[in-house]
A protein has these predicted regions:
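Gly/Pro-rich active-site loop or hairpin
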Residues: 46, 72-143
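Intrinsic disorder/low-complexity signal
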Residues: 183-206
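Amphipathic, non-transmembrane alpha-helical secondary structure
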Residues: 2, 6, 18-21, 25, ...
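Short, well-ordered coil/turn segments that N-cap beta-strands
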Residues: 30-35, 60-62, 97-101, 140-144
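Conserved, mostly hydrophobic/aromatic
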Residues: 67, 146
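Active-site-proximal loop/turn and secondary-structure-junction residues that shape catalytic pockets
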Residues: 39-43, 68-72, 107-109, 152-154
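C-terminal helical cap(s) of enzyme catalytic domains, especially alpha/beta-barrels
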Residues: 154-171
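Active-site acidic/histidine proton-transfer and metal-coordination neighborhood
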Residues: 1-66
Length: 206
């Protein structure tokens, strides 16, 4: 790991050194762009989540590029629920510390921990809905860009946007319902959870 970090530093440079950015002399005349370090999709290649986050934590000017298809494949289908995404980004927050992320998303066919090729999202066991749910509920702290890698590029880009919008709408509806319930419970002098139970019992009796 230290060898990879040192090599990235060697190429990209260190702004505290006199001869910084030797490979990119134009940097002296403008603000340097971020360099994305992407997770790889095969077991024998460098580029696990841990390795990528470690480099981005140590090398200024780099940003993690989390390829969800690759992560899902290397983890033998690890991204299945919103909690799986929460665990991934909690790990990123603890190790990397930043809030800027680029994410690639597409369906993926995988075998023995290796990504074989991208597919349409609907034809893969990697579903976007849990990711959309996580982003809607807990993603406000991130500056995130999601890039469609699907063979149906524009179609699946719109598919992802629609599911994210639906997840946001569901969250707003839940919050509005909880606020209404809390207000009614306060008026009746009871606990909101008690009112929720009464509402569920009334709905079941209908």
């Amino acid at each position: 790991m230290s060898g990879v970090v040192d090599r990235v530093r060697e190429v990209w440079g260190d702004e505290t050194e006199e001869e910084d950015y030797a490979a990119f002399p134009w940097v002296h005349e403008s603000e340097p762009s971020l360099v994305g370090i992407e997770t790889s999709g095969r077991q024998e290649l460098w580029g696990t989540v841990e390795e990528v986050l470690e480099v981005c934590n140590h090398v200024e000017g780099t940003v993690p590029v989390l390829n969800m298809g690759h992560i899902h494949a290397r983890g033998h289908g690890r991204l299945r629920t919103s909690e799986d995404y929460a665990e991934l980004f909690d790990q990123a927050r603890e190790t990397y510390g930043g809030s800027t992320f680029y994410c690639h998303f597409a369906g993926v066919e995988h075998r023995m921990g290796n990504a074989l090729h991208y597919t349409q999202i609907k034809k893969s066991d990697l579903k976007f809905e849990p990711f959309a749910e996580y982003l809607a509920e807990e993603g406000d702290w991130m500056d995130i860009t999601i890039i469609s890698d699907s063979p149906l590029l524009e179609h699946d880009a719109m598919y992802m946007l629609q599911h994210y919008d639906k997840a946001r709408q569901r969250l707003l509806e839940i919050r509005a319902r909880d606020e209404r319930r809390a207000k009614l419970a306060a008026q009746q002098g009871i606990d909101p959870e008690e009112l929720k139970i009464k509402e569920e019992e009334a709905a079941a009796a209908r």
